Amino acid sequence: MGKIIGIDLGTTNSCVAIMDGTTPRVLENAEGDRTTPSIIAYTQDGETLVGQPAKRQAVTNPQNTLFAIKRLIGRRFQDEEVQRDVSIMPFKIIAADNGDAWVEVKGQKMAPPQISAEVLKKMKKTAEDYLGEPVTEAVITVPAYFNDAQRQATKDAGRIAGLEVKRIINEPTAAALAYGLDKGTGNRTIAVYDLGGGTFDISIIEIDEVDGEKTFEVLATNGDTHLGGEDFDSRLINYLVEEFKKDQGIDLRNDPLAMQRLKEAAEKAKIELSSAQQTDVNLPYITADATGPKHMNIKVTRAKLESLVEDLVNRSIEPLKVALQDAGLSVSDIDDVILVGGQTRMPMVQKKVAEFFGKEPRKDVNPDEAVAIGAAVQGGVLTGDVKDVLLLDVTPLSLGIETMGGVMTTLIAKNTTIPTKHSQVFSTAEDNQSAVTIHVLQGERKRAADNKSLGQFNLDGINPAPRGMPQIEVTFDIDADGILHVSAKDKNSGKEQKITIKASSGLNEDEIQKMVRDAEANAEADRKFEELVQTRNQGDHLLHSTRKQVEEAGDKLPADDKTAIESALTALETALKGEDKASIEAKMQELAQVSQKLMEIAQQQHAQQQTAGADASANNAKDDDVVDAEFEEVKDKK
């Protein structure tokens, strides 16, 4: 069995890890970094850049550089959170035909799973380069508070990237695995506070050890899938824009290039303010008007940043209370607090969390790498490389169906351990009703319309009977990935209807297959491009070395040969400017054929140089027989 890699597919950064024996190892990417920016860029010449190369060119290509795509995955265009992003993102967010939030790049509509697949492909390639073998299986993490549609979309992204997603696990649970694996014995209850680039989760997890086997049981989870570092950046960007407008009278929001520069500067300033009390946002030539170029130079103190984002930090505290309440615990029952996600490096966040739990969070967990390490550990559990570890996760939101009067009837309550299965018998609302519609919902509200619709299906062929008589058994089955399968059965006729919830939104099978084929075609195009570049380099080298040999041969090269070589050199030079690998190879072959005489002359010259070198060495050897005498200076006595 091959390796199952662990991938933390983050909003801002992603990370990949593997099990090296029984030890998890975070892998460095091609740029030598342990984390990769979750940024994808589509350049003017049709190239797709991922990670640091994409980030570097963002300033000059803001409309075609996509970031924070995880905030759109599995979401509807009309969602309030998506509408907030539409107004602030430099790229174009659009409504797909099915109402999902998609992105338009260079006139082409793209689904978030398709874009996220580019990041996953880079993670896959990083692992393959390290292992020296193909990788086809992965454990991918998602925020604990992701709903069914978002989990399904993440699995789709894995498939498009050429990965079989063996398990979807929750980020805080993965972090707990990374933390708890090498810690001492005994039972502990931990709180994992995960504030990443775009999402926030809190999970209360109990780690029990019985006879050497560790059980990681999630007691409760809560969160906000639209709260993270990107929101903190936005607050600082808005402040800088307003300050500049006050000072210069120019609104930078109308200038995408300036906004992209400002985004980078704001992120940098936010990071600096975690260790410094103040920083300068200094952006020369940020824009220009009729009077000339304008420069931005604004001082930002840590206190100012904290005042801008205080409500965001406070927003993360309410879910902590709910999670503890759901787990039936109080603050004093928590043994350790673990911080995950880059935004937890902010001192204010650490202070608020410490105040809430009444204890300092642990500092021995790397907030950027813990989730990927935990995913790799789960991969090791699935392959059998990691033994004596049992993971019991929960479903984050209640699941149920719409019943008479537009009410949501819950079948599986939130924080139920998964996998799980639950059945309930319902009946008809009208006399002689021959069909029922099962409308599947996810959420905590009583009114069906206020919850997330996961999809609906019909059960036909019910035998005519008075209302309330037919018995329709509805079964909800949640697998270990947290993905829901629903069936409805008429107990009288035995008729049954089943669906795996693929949200009324989401990608259908044909779309996924098309994207998989596109990704494979792109991989083939990438391979051909790589081969073309290698051939070009060989051609360049041959061009340079042949010209040098012609120069060195001088008059020894017959005029006819020289003319033929010059002609072949020109032909190769022209071919190198094109995109045809076969043409370059043919011109290289022609040059090699007409350069026979030149090669002979070069070999003769080389042989002569070697002979001359040997003679010089022999003379030096003779000189070696001379004994050096030591002289002492004797001064005449005056």
UniProtKB/Swiss-Prot annotation:
The keyword Oxidoreductase does not apply. The keyword ATP-binding applies. One of its GO terms (molecular function) is ATP binding. InterPro entries: ATPase_NBD, Chaperone_DnaK, Heat_shock_70_CS, HSP70_C_sf, HSP70_peptide-bd_sf, Hsp_70_fam. Residues 602-638 are annotated as: Disordered. Pfam families: HSP70 (PF00012). Residues 602-620 have a biased composition (Low complexity). The modification N6-acetyllysine is found at K109, K245, K304, K421, K556. It comes from the Bacteria. The modification Phosphothreonine is found at T199. Keywords: Acetylation, ATP-binding, Chaperone, Nucleotide-binding, Phosphoprotein, Stress response. Induction: By stress conditions e.g. heat shock. Acts as a chaperone. Belongs to the heat shock protein 70 family. This is Chaperone protein DnaK. It comes from Escherichia coli O9:H4 (strain HS).
